[in-house]
Amino acid sequence: MPLVANSDLPAFERLREEGETVIPRDVALHQDIREMHIGLLNMMPDAALAATERQFFRLIGESNQIAQFYIHPFTLKEIQRSLEANHYVERYYQTFEQIQAEGLDALIITGANVTQPQLSLEPFWKPLIKVISWAYENVTSTLCSCLATHAVLDFRYGQKRRRLSSKRWGVYSHRVVNRSHPLVRGVNTRFDVPHSRFNEISRDQFEAAGLHVLAESEKGGAHLAVSEDLFRIVFCQGHPEYDSISLLKEYKREILRFASGQRDNYPPFPENYFSPKIQAILEEYQEQIIIARDKDLPLPQLPEPLIVDYLDNTWHDTAEAIINNWMGNVYQITHSDRKRPFMEDIAPDDPLGLRRPT
């Protein structure tokens, strides 16, 4: 169903150009269709701010529930940004105080760049806890992506993420391990998810916290899980929202870090992402980069036109199905008053009625 362009945020026009259904606010007001209000706490760095909006907006807009989706982006002022990015946020984003006053039906919390050895030392730590704590009491369901999952497991459940021996970077096959949960209804029992992280929460840690793992990977680890009530918090360790080119952009960034001396070794390929044909192109490019760096020559451009058309996206349809299920279940139990999380007959400790004895 359609996204509603409830502000001048450039993401709406970009998505419209890509073929997504986006309707003007004045048109939406004349349609007799229920509204749903979804918050997006966007903690990503400046360069990824707008792309992250589009990735999550697209997944929500592709849901086929009978509702108009109003998306409310906001961020945390404690995250350091450029002057240009701050102007962008001031123009297009709401404040957390506005979000609290108006209410939400659902909330998505993105990942973030970290600079400290422990999450609790990050400048955004306490404000993030405030948002998550408010959401648990006032929002029907919160979806946590990557670092947000690690933060919730840390402060709410006492499970600290653990450093991996090497970066988990690539596209990994996952298997649904709880096929009866509504979030994975109609989803392929095996599906791919991109990962890009140095740390993880293991399945044992999820289960020690009383949480329920729904999908995991032999190489990628636990990906999808839900809180003890089976719905109010949804955890993702991977990045199902990623575009086809997201890992390519990360790979390009790491090449530039190598060329500038910020990393010692040339970056490896993200696992299970580049085809043999693309790898051959990139191996030749690696030789050119090393020569340019060693001889202090201008760096050659990454031959993206030769690469992009051969990148396969093997995860988006499953991500779309899971978000569709999430939105559908929120729709079924959220209160018509967006300041209230549940309808009167919904039990907060079992909102989907999955724990009731049969």
UniProtKB/Swiss-Prot annotation:
Q: Which InterPro entries match?
A: Class_I_gatase-like, MetA_family
Record's Gene Ontology CC terms?
A: cytoplasm
Q: What is its main location?
A: cytoplasm
Kindly list the GO molecular function terms attached to this UniProt entry: homoserine O-acetyltransferase activity; homoserine O-succinyltransferase activity
Marked site (Important for substrate specificity) residue numbers: 196
Task: List the active-site residues.
Answer: 146 (acyl-thioester intermediate), 239 (proton acceptor), 241
Q: Where in the cell is it found?
A: Cytoplasm
Q: Which Gene Ontology terms describe the biological processes this protein takes part in?
A: methionine biosynthetic process
> Per the UniProt record, which EC number(s) apply here?
2.3.1.46
* A Pfam family per the record: HTS
What reaction does this enzyme carry out catalytically?
Answer: L-homoserine + succinyl-CoA = O-succinyl-L-homoserine + CoA
Chain positions of site Important for acyl-CoA specificity: 113, 147
Biological pathway: Amino-acid biosynthesis; L-methionine biosynthesis via de novo pathway; O-succinyl-L-homoserine from L-homoserine: step 1/1
Tell me which UniProt keywords the record has, alphabetically.
Acyltransferase, Amino-acid biosynthesis, Cytoplasm, Methionine biosynthesis, Transferase
Binding residues for substrate, per the UniProt record? 167, 196, 253
For this chain, the family text in UniProt reads: Belongs to the MetA family.
What does the function comment of this entry state?
Transfers a succinyl group from succinyl-CoA to L-homoserine, forming succinyl-L-homoserine.
Protein's UniProt name = Homoserine O-succinyltransferase
